[in-house]
């Protein structure tokens, strides 16, 4: 899959701390369509490791409960691209962040029958909805090599796994 343009000068230390999933987008609705869909994960915290890998603390729904888990994202030569082993090897790329308010990232997500599916999220430091950033996220999605659209707008806060 062709990867989206990323932040070439990402400073991994500055993304540390609490984040909230505000919106999820995907190239295929099946990736996110149910509460237990495999990529419907809610990011809680990013923890850079001493070796510049990134531990991602997240929650997802399993058997009607929210399960906390973590994924270790291994750094690559590109500071904004990480490899994770989550249902197979996948690339995560950071599209954009200002470190203090928002971060957009995408993960390769081959849906059944497609090679280059993708799931993207808009993360925010607080739960306060920001329409400007949401529009910016939407514009960022339009630059991607695959057709992708916002499927879940979480700014209304109805999701149970979102803290």
UniProtKB/Swiss-Prot annotation:
As one GO molecular function, the record gives: retinol binding
**Among its keywords, does the record have RNA-binding?**
no
Q: Does the keyword Secreted apply?
A: yes
Q: Do you know which Pfam families this protein is assigned to?
A: Lipocalin (PF00061)
**Listed SUPFAM superfamilies:** Lipocalins (SSF50814)
Q: Gene Ontology terms, cellular component aspect? A: extracellular region
Per the UniProt entry, the disulfide pairs are: 66-161, 106-120
**Location of this chain's protein in the cell:** Secreted
Q: Which UniProt keywords apply?
A: Disulfide bond, Milk protein, Retinol-binding, Secreted, Transport
Subunit details for this protein? Answer: Monomer.
Family, per the entry?
A: Belongs to the calycin superfamily. Lipocalin family.
Q: Which purpose does this protein serve, as stated in its record?
A: Lactoglobulin is the primary component of whey, it binds retinol and is probably involved in the transport of that molecule.
Q: Output this protein's name.
A: Beta-lactoglobulin-2
